[in-house]
Amino acid sequence: MFDIIKAVIIGIVEGLTEFLPISSTGHIDLVNHVIKLSQSQDFINMFEYVIQFGAILAVILLYFNKLNPFSKPTAKARNATWQLWAKVIIAVLPSVVVGLPLNNWMDEHLHTPLVVATTLIIYGVLFIILENYLKNKNAHITTLADITYQTALLIGLFQVLSIVPGTSRSGATILGALLIGTSRYVATEFSFFLAIPTMVGVSILKIGKYLWQGNGFSGEQWAVLMTGSIVSFLVAIVAIKWLLKFVQTHDFKPFGWYRIALGAIVLLVMFI
């Protein structure tokens, strides 16, 4: 019963932070240091990533018509949707090439409060610096159609940075997109779309690794996994709608300051 309650809390954290540029994995790592599940470490490692699938389902639900080429009434519209998917796949490729070989090493060595706190602060500072730089500049990529295949690849290269815990997948992609001239709204939406193949792939990889190690799922573990995923799905719907509305009238500096403050608090707790 206590693990179900913990799964609800972790699911809320995941749903709130997956698409905000503040690192969902970093937040979950920190939460797990306070209310760690009473399960094996193998299950916990898998759980942290697989509940992200619930958040991804929120994107699929909210953008189903926009991302479904078969729902388009004209050949031109269908072709535009297929092109968008092609750009998403191109953007994901760098993470596949770099992330897969380093996955196990990252899990074993970098999931620590010190690493999370450090990356929270570094990218918080970068967001503030970048937003100050962009203050009087106009974006030249203002629609998803404006994103070229080359631009998609560049954004995908930035996503590779998120393999370090605390960086934030959405944060890295949004930061990169802003840097190359994408509007905040389009950068945010494209980051959502990149999450679909990226996190579905990671979830499958983590489940496969968990089973390959000879583990199975008890009834309680299934309940914990489903609870966390469902809660993250529901909360992510709210978070996505809120973020899209927020970026239409605000920049990302508040997230930068939040990252710096949280990172500093973690460091203080560690060393005091």
Swiss-Prot record:
Transmembrane regions: 2-22, 43-63, 82-102, 110-130, 185-205, 224-244, 252-272
A GO BP annotation: response to antibiotic
The enzyme's E.C. designation: 3.6.1.27
Keywords (A to Z) from UniProt: Antibiotic resistance, Cell membrane, Cell shape, Cell wall biogenesis/degradation, Hydrolase, Membrane, Peptidoglycan synthesis, Transmembrane, Transmembrane helix
GO molecular function: undecaprenyl-diphosphatase activity
GO CC annotation terms, alphabetical: plasma membrane
Topology relative to the membrane: Multi-pass membrane protein
Keyword Transmembrane helix: yes
Primary location recorded for the protein, binned into one broad class: membrane
InterPro entries in the record: UppP
Class of enzymatic activity (EC top level): hydrolase
Domain of life: Bacteria
Reactions catalysed: di-trans,octa-cis-undecaprenyl diphosphate + H2O = di-trans,octa-cis-undecaprenyl phosphate + phosphate + H(+)
Subcellular location: Cell membrane
HAMAP family, sorted: Undec_diphosphatase
Role, per record: Catalyzes the dephosphorylation of undecaprenyl diphosphate (UPP). Confers resistance to bacitracin.
Family affiliation: Belongs to the UppP family.
Miscellaneous note of the record: Bacitracin is thought to be involved in the inhibition of peptidoglycan synthesis by sequestering undecaprenyl diphosphate, thereby reducing the pool of lipid carrier available.
Protein name (database record): Undecaprenyl-diphosphatase
Organism expressing this protein natively: Lacticaseibacillus paracasei (strain ATCC 334 / BCRC 17002 / CCUG 31169 / CIP 107868 / KCTC 3260 / NRRL B-441)
